[in-house]
Amino acid sequence: DNPLVRARAQESVEGMVQVYALCSTSIRKQTPLLCDEMDKFREKGLLGAPELQWGNKRKGALWMNEHKQEHFDGMKKIIRSKKKEDELNMILHWLQVPGLGLPKAGFMTQLVMGKGGCMDVHNIRKYLPEVDSSKGTPNRWQTSGQSEETKKRKAVDYLSFCKLAGGAKGLWDQWCDFIAEQYPDAFESGDHVSKLHPIWVS
């Protein structure tokens, strides 16, 4: 299912924006609510969707609306480069968007090119139990207000951690299975959760 999302993100500016909208909408939002929220996005767009009108989500939506073409072009350039550091370049590319820290920039890297991964609150509880997940992104991956050099160093550490936790595919499968267990009334299986991702961005 990830390749379908990837294709959507890479086919057009509109496709990339919709994948970004899914990523931003998913921040601190229960997964079963994403179907309704993405319907609202399709109806009202980036600057009208209710879930994207507050705090950092609003800042990100405004930025993306203004810079979407150049951001899409930059994303495609990284993908076409096929360099060994393309994963790092991509997560740093998405880290430019206001409101996206390393976990969600990693999620966008996962969605648009099948690399990276998302260390969301569920994965932080699982892989870093000593960290207080209620406080959001752990200090080791905080990038707000930090130098480009520090962001790059933290991104390298983040991507290494994702690989140890199973890589983009492993994290995707584990997360989908976990969400299905958490919300059995909403999802039949992890495969069901996975198959919804292309629908959310269609």
Walk through the language-model features, giving the residues of each:
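Short, amphipathic alpha-helical segments that act as regulatory/interfacial helices
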Residues: Y20-K29, L62-N65, C176, A180
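Structure-specific DNA junction-binding interface
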Residues: D1-G55
